[in-house]
């Protein structure tokens, strides 16, 4: 149970949204805003994501420490995610991002020293990036094998989850495949023929302690240089309008392409070749799994 929280929670309206952060104690976010201004969601995610989001978060961290002096404080600095996905870990842009984050951490340490506040700082990484140059579309594969069903509504192709025998929820280099009973073998055999990494059925998931009740009936991992996209349409003109925008709720999976803006169409790109960094596969060289 946390006593102090600030986390983005925009209020979605009919054709817009109000940027807001949920906070605890009540009105703590509003107090922070008085000192450093509103948290701008477009800095945090989307084609305009930048170090400004991390700067705001570090400044909010300083205010939290100064006003509440918590015993334990977790702060998420998102900046490395942007260059990591757009350019990959081998890029000069990613190295620049590392230096920028290093400066932010240094700034926080200097603040703690100036306040004579004794804190031990532990820096944790959620994941390591892999350089990628390929993308796989599990939902298109299921669609082409008549396992994922779609409906044409207003000239656009939408997934019919009720009638589908299987569909994929994609997240970077991992894809959860949800399958109706009786089709597990068929789906598994289809993906065994694809250029992917591994397939984990429920038995293998249990062995690896990843058999959550919400896990897919099978879980796919990609090859190291590849990642999974959520796309299901085979003709670009049939793609629903929301797929061209930053829309984290209606897409069946994470979409790194939301970091890319197509200047010609003024929309989010569908060009999977733009992504150069991803994560999620098991590092066999450094893992006991």
Predicted regions and their residues:
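Residue-level preference for the first positions of well-ordered beta-strands
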Residues: 70-74, 120, 217
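Metal-dependent active-site segment of extracytoplasmic phospho-/sulfohydrolases and closely related
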Residues: 99-143, 147-148, 220
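Surface-exposed helix-capping loop/turn segments at secondary-structure junctions
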Residues: 70, 109-119, 197-203
């Amino acid at each position: 149970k946390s006593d102090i929280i600030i986390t983005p929670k925009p209020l979605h309206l009919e054709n817009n949204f109000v940027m807001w952060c949920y906070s605890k104690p009540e009105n703590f976010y509003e107090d922070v805003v008085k000192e450093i201004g509103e948290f701008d969601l477009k800095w945090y995610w989307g084609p305009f994501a930048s170090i400004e989001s991390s700067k705001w978060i570090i400044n909010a961290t300083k205010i939290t420490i100064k006003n509440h002096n918590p015993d334990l404080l977790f702060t998420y600095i998102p900046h490395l995610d942007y260059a990591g996905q757009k350019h990959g870990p081998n890029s000069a842009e990613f190295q620049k991002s590392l230096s920028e984050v290093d400066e932010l951490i240094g700034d926080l340490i200097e603040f703690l020293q100036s306040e004579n506040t004794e804190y031990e700082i532990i820096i944790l990484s959620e994941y390591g990036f892999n350089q990628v140059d390929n993308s796989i579309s599990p939902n298109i594969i299921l669609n082409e094998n008549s396992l994922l069903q779609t409906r044409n509504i207003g000239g656009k192709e939408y997934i019919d989850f009720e009638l589908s025998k299987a569909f994929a929820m994609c997240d970077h280099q991992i894809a959860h495949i949800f399958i109706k009973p009786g089709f597990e073998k068929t789906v598994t055999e289809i993906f065994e023929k694809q250029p992917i990494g591994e397939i984990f059925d429920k038995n293998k998931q249990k062995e690896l302690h990843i058999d959550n009740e919400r896990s897919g009936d099978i879980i796919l991992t990609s090859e190291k240089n590849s990642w999974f996209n959520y796309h299901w349409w085979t003709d670009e003109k049939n793609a629903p309008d929301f797929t061209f925008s930053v829309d984290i709720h209606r897409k069946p999976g994470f979409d790194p392409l939301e970091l890319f803006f197509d200047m010609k169409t003024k929309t989010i790109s569908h060009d999977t070749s733009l992504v150069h960094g991803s994560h999620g596969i098991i590092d066999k060289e450094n893992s006991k799994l």
